[in-house]
Amino acid sequence: MKAATQARIDDSPLAWLDAVQRQRHEAGLRRCLRPRPAVATELDLASNDYLGLSRHPAVIDGGVQALRIWGAGATGSRLVTGDTKLHQQFEAELAEFVGAAAGLLFSSGYTANLGAVVGLSGPGSLLVSDARSHASLVDACRLSRARVVVTPHRDVDAVDAALRSRDEQRAVVVTDSVFSADGSLAPVRELLEVCRRHGALLLVDEAHGLGVRGGGRGLLYELGLAGAPDVVMTTTLSKALGSQGGVVLGPTPVRAHLIDAARPFIFDTGLAPAAVGAARAALRVLQAEPWRPQAVLNHAGELARMCGVAAVPDSAMVSVILGEPESAVAAAAACLDAGVKVGCFRPPTVPAGTSRLRLTARASLNAGELELARRVLTDVLAVARR
């Protein structure tokens, strides 16, 4: 046996992790977990609880009631024992709210994207994905065994070229409606025009659109595209609805097909009833209190002005680009020390040289919280931008 081979055998099979961790630390890309307290001790401008519903009494009560009626867990795949009347009622109610014909719940937004993209593509088909699509869409494309073309960010002409030159009979264009790193909107109307020109399906991830755009119904609804026969919507229950889970919404045949073909649906345990009950209650609060989506956008605009961001936000998110990872990490830490928790995005989540703070607005922010945010952000960014 060669000496180099013997040395590799003698080493721990995980020895390589030490070098990887050193490289991450040197690049300012090391991550760690920070448990949040049960009672917040700082102002939250980092979570995705856009409508402020995760602690709403009605939402908590909805989860508790479902827990008492249906038990703690789904107990199995929805095809075995994990389906309940509650699941199907909420699917129908959410579909009606966003203007879709039908919906199918998954255990997370991530698995909803995996199930939808892989289930609607496969060998012999083409997937066209935006360069800044969410990681769940990226992974879904990789798992699909379809040919994948990644187009430049928000480049409709590149999507058109990919579809025009294809040999595959089936094609699916996938995009976020609201891109998570900077809160920008996808050119959804233009993408659908291109898809229709070439006979392709459009799949739109509304994770950051639901509850904020279109009066809470999402960007597709706002653009008058909800319920289109050649559009599929995915979204999560973990952001605006303050719960957990994911859903695919679209034509009724899509739901029927995914029940038979989506592996994350077939083989995963069904979504816990408490999560469904909480999300259902949150949807009812949103319907009863339609002021919440506009409040999110209004507060996002205030946060942008505090940070000197000229563009009016199109979503709950405000992106403050600082450049290198170390600058963003230091600024986020300084904000936290001063009582304001903000998001910190670094590569590979965002391109190199664009590490940033990401602030997320909530409908429930009050005047005192906004004033605290103004003081802290003004001081921290003055130092970070020197």
Swiss-Prot record:
What EC number(s) does this enzyme carry? 2.3.1.47
| CC annotations in GO | peptidoglycan-based cell wall; plasma membrane
Q: Which residues bind substrate?
A: 31, 134, 349
Q: Per its Swiss-Prot or TrEMBL record, what regulates the activity?
A: Inhibited by D-alanine and D-7-keto-8-amino-pelargonic acid.
Knockout-associated phenotype: Cells lacking this gene are shown to be highly attenuated in a mouse tuberculosis model. Essential for growth even in liquid culture; growth does not occur on biotin-containing medium after biotin deprivation.
The residues listed in the UniProt record as binding pyridoxal 5'-phosphate, with positions renumbered to this chain, are 109-110, 180, 205-208, 236-239
Keywords, in A-Z order:
Acyltransferase, Biotin biosynthesis, Pyridoxal phosphate, Transferase
The UniProt catalytic activity note for this protein reads:
6-carboxyhexanoyl-[ACP] + L-alanine + H(+) = (8S)-8-amino-7-oxononanoate + holo-[ACP] + CO2
Q: Which GO terms describe its biological process?
A: biotin biosynthetic process
Q: Which Gene Ontology MF annotations are present?
A: 8-amino-7-oxononanoate synthase activity; pyridoxal phosphate binding
Q: Which InterPro entries match?
A: Aminotrans_II_pyridoxalP_BS (IPR001917), Aminotransferase_I/II_large (IPR004839), AON_synthase_class-II (IPR050087), PyrdxlP-dep_Trfase (IPR015424), PyrdxlP-dep_Trfase_major (IPR015421), PyrdxlP-dep_Trfase_small (IPR015422)
Family, according to the entry, reads as follows:
Belongs to the class-II pyridoxal-phosphate-dependent aminotransferase family. BioF subfamily.
Q: What does this protein do?
A: Catalyzes the decarboxylative condensation of pimeloyl-[acyl-carrier protein] and L-alanine to produce 8-amino-7-oxononanoate (AON), [acyl-carrier protein], and carbon dioxide. Can also use pimeloyl-CoA instead of pimeloyl-ACP as substrate. To a lesser extent, can also utilize D-alanine instead of L-alanine as substrate.
**Name recorded for this polypeptide:** 8-amino-7-oxononanoate synthase 1
Per the UniProt record, the source organism is Mycobacterium tuberculosis (strain ATCC 25618 / H37Rv)
